């Protein structure tokens, strides 16, 4: 991953965390890693454990951030959620997986928009 992509990703994750806190979420951890992958943000929304995938883009040339959640990524997110819940003995706790889509200006690196989609893998 290039340094520019890393920077854009970091900007997106920081903006997402700040946005979620403004919405009343309590951030538990950022960049939770386990053998099968990484969860960008884990937070609490009242009594619900929320695992949040952050997708950051500087343009829509390769699709929107939401469109970047492939079937394989969805399967991995489900496995990551199960792994986290089991590791922390939270299997009986309500849980959902959300997406925070962040658009960043390519030149200034300023956040242009944030879109929060709750329960992206429901249904």
Regions from the PLM with identified roles:
Residues 35-37:
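Short acidic/glycine-enriched loop/turn segments that link adjacent beta-strands
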Residues 26, 49, 94:
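Hydrophobic "anchor" residues on beta-strands that sit immediately upstream
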